[in-house]
């Protein structure tokens, strides 16, 4: 297995690309920037299965020439958005451990930030393996155990003496992200291998400083408002009113990249794995 450490310049180019989709949602553009940069080292073509497809906008940004794509999403509304996008030839409303497609029928599969949310991980990976042709690959991004370990907001609130509020914030954060599988890197590799895959490429994403600031932004964004909804519904229009924000936030990410000291220990990972039988 090759470990690919991303140069800072590639992460920043990733931000330049994804900020066009999410210019005023900083936690989303930050995380997606690392994923985008990682996928530049992957190649998918032919008939493609997108597992947990959502609305297809990010898929189209990463793989603009892909034109034979089938999506799967268990959420009816997300699946409908995928159908309306024009990205997919077909979108199944189905759980990923029960994909209504034939054996050995896809050249590649893609699962962006979806596997960690799925309750039947071994079944999902086995189903992706079943659908892939021999030699086919899965490109995917996932979170690791550090995603929880480095969550700053509950820790800071607890340090201020508000233990009950800290526990509530942590629960809300985990409930929102529905993290069924915040595995270690070794745990992810073992899961892929159990399903019959061999891991060819691992790209660590979001080391400690990037991850800590990302988690703080994301946690604040999703804090529940007393009046209903999330704090993010107040933050986004505030940021949207400033046309300088996307470029200014790029400078912040650049500073965080300069601060990193360990690029292997990260809260996320991007993998390329291959079906070997």
Regions found by a protein language model. Give the residues of each.
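A structural helix-start
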Residues: 118-122, 146
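Conserved class I S-adenosyl-L-methionine
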Residues: 139-165
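A short glycine-rich, Lys/Arg-flanked "PGG" loop and its adjoining helix->strand segment in the class I
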Residues: 122-137
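A C-terminal cap/extension of S-adenosyl-L-methionine-dependent methyltransferases
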Residues: 156-157, 190, 200-277
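Conserved N-terminal segment of class I S-adenosyl-L-methionine
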Residues: 1-98, 102, 263-271
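Acceptor-substrate binding/catalytic loop of class I
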Residues: 171-187
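A conserved beta-strand element that flanks and buttresses the S-adenosyl-L-methionine
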Residues: 110
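Short catalytic micro-motifs in class I SAM-dependent methyltransferases
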Residues: 113-117
